[in-house]
């Protein structure tokens, strides 16, 4: 319907920005054949999958502010990445690897944490699997802190989201 179309348009910039980040990851892969850029690529892909689930199952209607929080976080990451990207591409020395490694950690912590934050805010979440595929060991301490605040969703991400219904009662008005 018209309202859902407006919602999709409203959040299109978030998807656009994530795909832009993914494109930048692809452009850096040639210079870094080891797993660093692939890790970024997997992270961004997992974010897109999680957000697609939010749209597919109508979760935006229940907590639209959650996507706004993620959008702001991704914008911050994108802005912080732009000067780093120039530095990485211009300097062909060991500092290049250090900079990209730092960015991998930043993007993993920020985006994965934000997706966990979105999905943990919905009550009817089932069928979890380990989140460890999406985060490096360096990022794990921060994610553990984030996830500790989101019990009972402990160190897990949803693979499927089940909603009661077709007659879901609207959330209480604020």
Residue ranges of predicted features:
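Intrinsically disordered, low-complexity Ser/Thr-rich segments densely containing proline-directed motifs
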Residues: 1-2, 174
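Extended cytosolic scaffolds built from alpha-helical repeats
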Residues: 3-100, 106-115, 120-125
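Alpha-helical bundle/repeat cores within regulatory domains of eukaryotic proteins
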Residues: 83-172
């Amino acid at each position: 319907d018209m309202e859902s179309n407006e919602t999709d348009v409203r959040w299109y910039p978030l998807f656009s920005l994530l795909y832009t980040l993914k494109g930048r990851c692809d452009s850096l892969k040639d210079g870094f054949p080891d797993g660093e850029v692939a890790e970024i690529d997997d992270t961004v892909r997992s974010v897109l999958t999680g957000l697609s689930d939010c749209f597919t199952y109508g979760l935006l209607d229940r907590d639209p502010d959650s996507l706004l929080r993620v959008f702001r976080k991704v914008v911050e990451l994108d802005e912080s990445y732009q000067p780093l990207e120039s530095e990485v591409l211009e300097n062909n020395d060991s500092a290049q690897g250090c900079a990209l490694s730092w960015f991998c950690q930043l993007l993993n912590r920020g985006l994965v944490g934000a997706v966990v934050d979105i999905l943990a805010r919905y009550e009817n979440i089932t069928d979890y699997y380990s989140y460890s595929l999406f985060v490096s060991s360096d990022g794990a301490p921060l994610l553990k802190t984030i996830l500790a605040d989101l019990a009972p969703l402990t160190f897990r991400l949803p693979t499927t989201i089940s909603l009661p219904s077709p007659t879901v009662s609207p959330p209480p008005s604020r």
